[in-house]
Amino acid sequence: MESKPFTLPSQSATVLIGTQFGDEGKGKLVDYLSDQYDIVVRYQGGANAGHTICFDGKSVVLHLIPSGIFNEKCVCVIGNGVVIDPVALLEEIAKVEELGYTVKGRLFISHNAHLIMPYHKRLDALHESAQGGQKIGTTGRGIGPSYEDKFARKGIRVVDLLSPGLLQEKLRENLAEKNKLFRNIYEGDEIDVESMVREYEEFDKLMDPYITNTQLYLNRQLRQGKTVLLEGAQGCLLDVDHGTYPYVTSSSPTSGGACTGSGIAPNHIGKVIGVCKAYMTRVGNGAFPTELNDATGEMLGRVGHEFGATTGRKRRCGWIDLVAMRYSVAVNGITELALTKLDVLDGFEEIKVCNSYMLNGKEIRDFPTDHQTLSAVQPVYTTLKGWMASNAAARTFEGMCPEAREYVAFLERELEVPVTFISVGPGREETVFR
């Protein structure tokens, strides 16, 4: 009997990740690239991340729905690695529909994704306030407590909405435990079980059209030759395993997290695009070696409009850190870089780039992820000439001013990865591809 020929993986999936502390401008790139892909997948995080998309004179922030939703030919998937607040998701669906875009039939939600419950959000706020000076700087959206329940095997999943009896049972079990915490530890009010049961039974009807086995769906689509873009939230340096622990998020924004959070095998991935700002920002607490607590940092924040899309919090600003970037390139297997917000540097006569650190009198080029060591390093800078001109009209690399081109070339030489995308302004069209 003749053997059946093997079908090799298509490698038609691309992962797009943040290489820094999040807020790198991934939303613009996903929106721009979505017309080149059949499916866009969000694979981790929750409503704690905001992706801002600018088009047709509008600025839209999405927290859960993938940025590809604004391309009518693109299907969007919320993967099993995401934790979903049903209230936030339904509000977001309504917002997208109000803008005139079709959602039903174009958005699919993994039946294995976990739900963020009201008690998760309350626990998040109570726990953070109890930390005093040791606050992590969470968004208060219930992300951490939801992931805690997931890994403690107590979580409620999207699929549970489809079984009212099971949903009630799980809600009662969870609330019995959580109400003890509210009553005995935090000395607060309990959450009413019956009202929550009624509320979440309604979510079954509203979310049912979107729920499916997305792992099965995605693998079938890949076998049929469809292309997939996997969209990460936050950034590599906030990864729960590879980030600046404990000042991290509760999930895995890395390229490895793309596989576990979507159900797509690694051998389907052909490219890993790393998104980085031309400078650096961080929201919340945690070590930040190149942070600028001076007029330069204020200028970066003001020109770059550096306020969190989710919380509105002011972002901490500093020069780009290539020690951290080299680490991100290695951990994620990045094949190309997308450089965003280059226009924010237009008004600087000199631009500094951190190439190494000083630690206890020694120069180091490796990134320490433990908070204590990272807090002790001092950045060593290389100073480059600024360009003091706008590149907003440039649509080719050659059309950019020489100093801006040299800045990009310097990053490529140091990181040994090509920069294939350069954002020279917030608009969709203000983009240079190479």
UniProtKB/Swiss-Prot annotation:
Residues that hold Mg(2+) according to the record: D23, G50
Keywords: Cytoplasm, GTP-binding, Ligase, Magnesium, Metal-binding, Nucleotide-binding, Purine biosynthesis
Residues annotated to bind GTP: 22-28, 50-52, 315, 341-343, 423-425
InterPro entries reported for this sequence: Adenylosuccin_syn_GTP-bd, Adenylosuccin_syn_Lys_AS, Adenylosuccinate_synth_dom1, Adenylosuccinate_synth_dom2, Adenylosuccinate_synth_dom3, Adenylosuccinate_synthetase, P-loop_NTPase
Annotated Gene Ontology cellular component terms: cytoplasm
SUPFAM superfamilies: P-loop containing nucleoside triphosphate hydrolases
Note on how the cofactor is bound: Binds 1 Mg(2+) ion per subunit.
EC number: 6.3.4.4
GO MF annotations, alphabetized: adenylosuccinate synthase activity; GTP binding; magnesium ion binding
TM helices/strands, residue ranges: none
Subcellular location: Cytoplasm
Biological process (GO), any one: IMP metabolic process
Pfam families the record matches: Adenylsucc_synt
Binding-site list for substrate: A309, T310, T311, G312, R313, K314, R315
Active site: D23 (proton acceptor), H51 (proton donor)
Top EC group: ligase
SMART domains documented for this protein: Adenylsucc_synt (SM00788)
Reaction(s) catalysed (UniProt annotation): IMP + L-aspartate + GTP = N(6)-(1,2-dicarboxyethyl)-AMP + GDP + phosphate + 2 H(+)
Keyword Ligase: yes
Pathways per UniProt: Purine metabolism; AMP biosynthesis via de novo pathway; AMP from IMP: step 1/2
Cofactor dependency: Mg(2+)
Domain of life: Bacteria
Function description: Plays an important role in the de novo pathway of purine nucleotide biosynthesis. Catalyzes the first committed step in the biosynthesis of AMP from IMP.
UniProt subunit comment: Homodimer.
Name of the protein in its database record: Adenylosuccinate synthetase
High-level lineage: Bacteria, Pseudomonadati, Chlorobiota, Chlorobiia, Chlorobiales
